Amino acid sequence: MSQVPRLTVGLAVYNGENFLAESLEALLGQSYEDFELVISDNASTDGSADICHRYAKRDSRIRYFRQPRNIGSAPNHNFVIHQARGELFKTAAHDDLYGRELLELCVAALDDDPGIVLAHSWSAVIDENAEVTKVVDYPVNTAAPEATERFRSMLFDGWGDDEGGVVRTDVLRRGALHGSYHFADRTFTIELALHGPFFMVPDYLYFRRYHSGQAGKISNIRRRCANLDPRRANRLANPVARLYAEYIWGYVSAIRRAPLSAAEKGHCYRVLARWIAGRAAPVTSRTLTRSGLSGEETFAPPPREISVDAVVARGERRVQ
């Protein structure tokens, strides 16, 4: 690794001992080695800290931080972004797995085309035992040269796992970071797309894990937002209508900040208005679910047998 690493991998974790070691093995076993791994432990109460300390002693690329209290998922994610020293940045999760060549191929794609702002790969879903159960379709036209088309497609055509791609850090810091409202990951990713096209490595190198304990399974908007930031737990200060309005305002703010012409911004505002009109419904904590107000993810059976062990560096396995 160079004195100042070219890439920062940021991993925010809270009580992740069940899959954390697996994820660290996959990240530290990457064929691309010029990166630092910034871990922010959100005051975990399980064995996460011990795992992080053990790996930090073995690999100097790890910078481990522990929050004195639970600051919430969103501020914890933003903390690792603020700590980044690399010109490139990738968000990692404690329970996901990564093919050995993921970072190498994403960095190469960004080097080959300075106009691209983010590179990722095709993704598949794995279970608790790291077996592939389905693949994530990617019908989104994030490679379009026109920002207006990328914006339209991300609102109407579906969704993927772009927020976990390798992105140019300067672009990342031009916009808003992770908000503490429902779907903040989507406004975050769409803002990146307004700055430039994405590139998808045509291979399954990212494995998103579905398991019973993950925060993404929280369906109630109030509970989800309180997980993102404990200050959201106050029901009176954070009615559902406000959380929904913040979500919509996230898109408006992204358009306002984007490096677009007045005509392009006007086009995006009209697309957003059409999208909102098509989804107008009474907003309650039940209706504002993961797929209720944004392009839905679609899945398919694996087109071929995909072996996680064949492409992912594996060492320690999950804590049972």
Please describe what each predicted stretch is.
Residues 67-84, 97:
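Glycine-rich, basic loop-to-helix element that forms the pyrophosphate-binding segment
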Residues 41-50, 69, 93:
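A conserved acidic beta->alpha catalytic loop
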Residues 4-7, 28-39, 47, 60-63:
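Short loop->beta transition adjacent to catalytic acidic/histidine clusters or analogous donor-positioning motifs
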Residues 21, 46-54, 101:
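Acidic helix N-cap motif at the loop->helix transition within catalytic regions
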Residues 9, 82, 99, 143-225:
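Conserved nucleotide-sugar donor-binding catalytic segment
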Residues 89:
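Short aromatic/hydrophobic "clamp" motif used to bind/position activated sugar donors
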Residues 15-29:
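Short, well-formed alpha-helical segments that are part of the catalytic scaffolds
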Residues 101-135:
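Conserved donor NDP-sugar-binding/catalytic core segment of glycosyltransferases
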